[in-house]
Amino acid sequence: MIRKTSVLRSNFIGIYAKAWDDVAFITMMADEKTVADFQEVLQVDVRRISIDNSSLIGTMMVMNSNGLIVPYGSEITGLGDLDGRNVLQLKDKINAIGNDIIANDHGAIIHKNFSNRSRKEIEDTLGVETIRTTIGNILTVGSAGILTSKGMLVNPETDDDELEFLRDFFKVSVKSGTANFGSIYVGASIVANSKGVLVGKDTTPIEMDRIDDVLS
């Protein structure tokens, strides 16, 4: 299932929310209709949270089935039970965790400037191998792609060799494309898990077909 929605009247819904196959988190300020969209499409428990009183929770967290990572010293409200996941408050000069890490249960790509210590902590928390690289020449890899346990959409600057590498590394189908009427920052424009996909309201029918094809 794929559906258009907005969060706080923004079509860049990925900066306000994060999802996996068993739970989704959304800004505390989201309205009831938006939360209902997330519940119906993603088919998971949707929890309103805040991180350091910010609504931009999608930029500040990453998770897979094994773990969840937020910036060091974060005050989190509404997180609830995480079903045995490892939880890491990562101490690094890079603190936009959701923008700078993209992961599933097979691997994680991280920003090139993470320290060696941080890289080891990320691997231990998420239970996967990590690689420091870019996606389509974008350093903020979490904003350059959207990844689930079934598929991955990356920005259109990603070349064929890179697409093949991503397929092998994450063990999912991978395609390039845009959302929100041509935005290359698909991670900021989409929230998805293996059950459904939410996209910003500016996303065109052609974009939706491509997104649905690779993620649904």
UniProtKB/Swiss-Prot annotation:
Pfam families: eIF-6 (PF01912). GO terms for biological process: cytosolic ribosome assembly. It comes from the Archaea. InterPro entries: eIF6 (IPR002769). Keywords: Initiation factor, Protein biosynthesis. Signal peptide: none annotated. GO terms for molecular function: ribosome binding; translation initiation factor activity. NCBIfam families: eIF-6, PRK04046.2-2. Binds to the 50S ribosomal subunit and prevents its association with the 30S ribosomal subunit to form the 70S initiation complex. Belongs to the eIF-6 family. This is Translation initiation factor 6. It comes from Thermoplasma acidophilum (strain ATCC 25905 / DSM 1728 / JCM 9062 / NBRC 15155 / AMRC-C165). The gene is eif6.
